[in-house]
Amino acid sequence: QAIDELAAHGLIAMLEPFMSSRVNGKVGNDLTPDAVIKSMHISQGLGATSAFTWMKLPVVPEMDRVMDATTLPTLLLGGDPADPDEAFASWEKALALPSVRGLIVGRTMLYPPDDDVSSAVATAVSMVR
């Protein structure tokens, strides 16, 4: 209902779908490509229209296959990477995919391992088209 109401007003719904489960009493997200695709397929079916619906997705292995499974515009989530250089490389590769429109990053920019926020932000900005 919320997605329909947003669309009726020409407002964007940003969906951040995950397949989650409890392991040892803690909720965890399944970040396999197949799980991300499944969560997207479920989310894409919400509402009477997807005209104003965007996805917010984690960068996972096989992002080209993941993005082939949707026509919706998508923003990439930064996640909590252990290796910033690896994260930047995976973001750059994913940003080249046609329906990826940008990044939504937080901790990676605010708390880089080397404490150089300016450099981390500059690196991310250089990737966005």
Residue ranges and their predicted role:
Residues 110-129:
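C-terminal helical cap(s) of enzyme catalytic domains, especially alpha/beta-barrels
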Residues 79-81, 98-115:
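Glycine-rich phosphate-binding active-site loops on the catalytic face of alpha/beta enzymes
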Residues 1-72, 82-102, 127:
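Alpha/beta enzyme core
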